[in-house]
Amino acid sequence: MSAIIFIVETLLSLALFVVLARLLLQWTRADFRNPLCQAVVRITNPIILPLRRVLPPVGKLDTASVVAVLLIATVDVACIFALHGLGFPPALLWVRPVLTEIARTLLWTYLSAIFLYALLSLIAPGGYSPLQSVLATLCEPVLRPIRRLIPAVAGLDLSPLWAIIAIQAVLILMR
């Protein structure tokens, strides 16, 4: 039974990650001609396009992506409750676990993105790759305020380190 729980939780977490990544890429105005962005769009289109017919965007906010994130997180929490034999709580008690799951996935997404961004900048500084372009677009809105507070030391940008520490602290507090 634990193998089934692991597989279901992993698949739903990956689905939530990909749809959340699409929302973040739209929010940061990533270049959707980038091959990685195109892959995310192709993977998420079966979920997003039917919702978009019903839920048009409101300003810059893609409501279809937001609703997809909420739906997948709700299904994820429901499956976790069901597979662990906890039953289904009343609707109002779902709000906190669903929002916690979304926040946790968002934080892990940014933690991973910032780590990869810092690693790529150390391995190939000034180089270009589709991954590096997407990571820069995602990470800069988070790293820019930290850079204003903590300047580079001897040419070494420590903002990714501080961002990772802050994200880890928030993840620990969420336990």
How would you label these PLM feature ranges?
Residues 1-175:
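Selective transmembrane helix interface/packing segments
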